């Protein structure tokens, strides 16, 4: 497959940031946007799912990286990098936690940075987002237009459920039935409480990213904790930059240290999640937290 999937010039070794939703990947992408060599693209899900939109979940493996699909993805990212006048791609899409094997097949030399955050913090933040409805109305039209423009017409119907649910949530002011990465089996959770759904979602997504990443060479995948990034931004970013084989950037470091969130927010869930909620989510979060090195 490697021979068939020859990569184009500026996407030879893209930097792909993976991390579950509400893990700090948007902020980290804004940090790397300060690097003069990088063209950063946030959440072009429709590029990664091109040709695979009828899948029942967001999981893609090397078997899904058919030559014409891989070629389209590389060409689309190549055009983006060139349009920005940069030399290298930096990309982040939360559902790519479930596509690491696919990414490695499309970009064999990709540098995959996995940003891991405590599942309780993710749960706390995602709960707020699920209630809020996310996008401002004026952004919905442009997002849907961009998505459909980048999708083959025969795959347009595959996007309808997500469009319908988003519009319904906005019009009725009711929470979305589901939001974020869709691991295998996600449909089976919908009859359960939103707390259980969010807990299972984080555990399944984080564990698959860790498992798939650990099967790659250490030169292709590296995992970093969000908590370390916040407490020691310079040290953690230096390690990321070295792993990605980027040149140093004072502008990047200055932006990170001036915009980093207060350390006090990292365990905010302790004050905001009551005992009942903690008891509900613990059976679903604790095994994954323990496996990933967190204490309950």
Functional labels for PLM-detected ranges:
Residues 22-23, 45-47, 95-97, 118-122, ...:
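Short, solvent-exposed loop/turn segments at secondary-structure junctions
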């Amino acid at each position: 497959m490697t021979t068939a999937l020859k990569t184009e010039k500026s996407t030879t070794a893209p930097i792909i940031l993976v991390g579950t939703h509400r893990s700090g990947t948007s902020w980290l992408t804004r940090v790397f946007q300060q690097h003069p060599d990088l063209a950063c693209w946030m959440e072009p899900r429709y590029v990664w799912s091109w040709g695979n939109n009828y899948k029942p979940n967001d999981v893609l493996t090397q078997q899904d990286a058919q030559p014409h699909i891989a070629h389209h993805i590389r060409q689309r990212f190549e055009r983006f990098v060139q349009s920005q006048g940069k030399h290298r791609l930096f990309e982040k899409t939360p559902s790519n936690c479930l596509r690491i094997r696919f990414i490695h097949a499309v970009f064999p030399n990709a540098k995959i940075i996995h940003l891991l955050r405590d599942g309780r913090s993710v749960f706390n933040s995602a709960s707020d987002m699920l209630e809020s409805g996310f996008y401002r109305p004026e952004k919905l039209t442009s997002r849907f237009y961009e998505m459909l423009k980048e999708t083959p017409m025969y795959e347009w119907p595959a996007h309808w459920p997500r469009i319908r649910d988003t519009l319904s949530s906005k019009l009725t002011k009711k929470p979305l039935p589901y939001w974020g990465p869709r691991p295998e089996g996600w449909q089976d959770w919908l009859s359960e409480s939103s707390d259980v759904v969010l807990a299972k979602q984080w555990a399944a997504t984080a564990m698959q990213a860790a498992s798939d990443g650990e099967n790659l060479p250490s030169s292709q995948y590296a995992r970093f904790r969000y908590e370390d990034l916040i407490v020691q931004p310079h040290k953690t970013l230096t390690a990321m930059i070295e792993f990605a084989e980027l040149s140093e950037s004072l502008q990047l470091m200055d932006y990170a240290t001036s915009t980093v969130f207060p350390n006090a927010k990292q365990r905010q869930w302790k004050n905001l999640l009551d005992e009942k909620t903690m008891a509900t989510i613990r059976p679903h979060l604790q095994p994954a937290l323990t496996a990933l090195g967190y204490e309950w």
